[in-house]
Curated annotation (Swiss-Prot):
The modification N6-(pyridoxal phosphate)lysine is found at residue 217. The keyword Lyase does not apply. NCBIfam families: hisC (TIGR01141). The lineage of its organism: Bacteria, Pseudomonadati, Pseudomonadota, Betaproteobacteria, Neisseriales. It catalyses: L-histidinol phosphate + 2-oxoglutarate = 3-(imidazol-4-yl)-2-oxopropyl phosphate + L-glutamate. HAMAP family: HisC_aminotrans_2. Its EC number is 2.6.1.9. It comes from the Bacteria. PANTHER family: HISTIDINOL-PHOSPHATE AMINOTRANSFERASE (PTHR42885:SF2), HISTIDINOL-PHOSPHATE AMINOTRANSFERASE-RELATED (PTHR42885). This is Histidinol-phosphate aminotransferase.
């Protein structure tokens, strides 16, 4: 007798929905923390010429065509740290959870945070432990340390700064987590280009620290490249579960090209930080909204009726992220990506119209 799909699929997988990506054609797209600017036209032409030389008939080499060395030089990755590349940071999370999924092992994360920590615990068979943030989205360090002591997790994920809330925890707080954790601590620095601190200087020095980043928020979301730095012992184990040739030759070539022009992306990041400050101030000036501090390229707000404001913005041609309903602490919250000056002006105008 043949079994049905429902009989074959794990019950915990059958019970969830697939990750939903909203259709964005025709919208001002402020839902996914993307850089609003394409490459300058002259760099587009140079990149096209570079990609035309890529040998598409060959697999990528084991070192990523020199990409690891380029990343190390561009982002001051310590010489003591090894590097692993991923098809976006999502794949790096998968590698970590797969490598650590012993029977009974636990993954601990702060909540609310990046949804893929919890999802990958489910996919890999790790027990998930969530530790709530305080109501203002700051870290409850005593509760976190108590949970680490009680649960003895194999891995702790810390989003630094935190998505989807925006604040960056104190460096001393994260150091306390590293000291208390019996296993690996993953510091996810996806938004490092917009933040005032980094743990990259300790990669390879702290034995239980892995620093994870992506080029997506910098302006290269389309090429799907993540990288992580940690002691060589950790990188060696992650490479055992990493699929061969996981980063394709076009991504490698595009990333190496972009790193030669990092000044362009750094200028854009600086402009987005300035726009974030303006947007945050304008949102905070609206008495109907509570705007939370952010060191990322988005601002999270709480509104009296977030679903209604979300629908109003959508009807106005602006797509944002509705957080309401995803976690109790995110009740009536919305996440607004920092866009270009014109996009931010349109967003503010639409919000102001809603409250008239």
């Amino acid at each position: 007798m043949k079994l049905t799909v429902q009989q074959l699929v794990r019950p915990e997988i059958a019970a969830i929905g697939a990750y939903h990506v909203a259709a964005a054609d025709g919208f001002i797209k402020l839902d996914a923390m993307e850089n609003p600017w394409p490459l300058p036209i002259e760099l587009q032409h140079e990149l096209a010429a570079e990609l035309a030389q890529v040998a598409l008939n060959r697999y990528p080499d084991a070192d990523g065509g020199g990409l690891k060395a380029a990343l190390r030089a561009a982002f001051a990755i310590p010489a003591a740290a090894g590097i692993v590349l991923g098809n976006g940071s999502d794949e790096l999370i998968t590698l970590v959870t797969q490598a650590l999924a012993r029977p009974g092992a636990k993954l601990l994360a702060l909540e609310p945070s990046f949804v893929m920590y919890k999802m990958n615990a489910l996919f890999s068979g790790l027990q998930y432990v969530g530790v709530p943030l305080r109501a203002d989205f700051t870290l409850d360090l005593p509760a976190t340390l108590a949970a680490i002591e009680r649960e003895q997790p194999a891995v702790v994920f810390v989003s630094y700064p935190n998505n989807p809330t925006g604040p960056r925890y104190g460096r001393d707080e994260v150091m306390a987590i590293c000291r208390a954790a019996p296993g690996l601590v993953v510091v996810d620095e996806a938004y490092q280009s917009f933040a005032s601190d980094s743990f990259m200087d300790l990669a390879g020095e702290l034995d239980n620290l892995l620093v994870m980043r992506t080029l997506s928020k910098l302006g290269l979301a389309g090429i799907r490249l993540g990288y992580a730095a940690a002691s060589p012992a950790w990188i060696n184990e992650l490479n055992k579960v990493r699929p061969p040739y996981n980063v394709n030759v076009l991504t490698i070539a595009a990333a190496r090209f972009a790193l030669k022009h990092l000044d362009v992306f750094n200028r854009q990041a600086a402009e987005l930080r300035a726009e974030r400050a303006k947007l945050s101030a304008a949102l905070a000036a609206l008495p109907q909204l509570a705007a939370f501090p952010s060191e990322a390229n988005f601002v999270t707000v709480r509104a009296p009726d977030a679903p209604a404001l979300f629908q109003h913005l959508k009807a106005s041609g602006i797509l944002i992220k509705q957080l309401h309903g995803s976690h109790p602490l995110l009740e009536n919250c919305l996440r607004l990506t920092v866009g270009s000056p014109d996009e931010n002006a349109a967003l503010l105008s639409a919000i102001q119209r809603f409250f008239v």
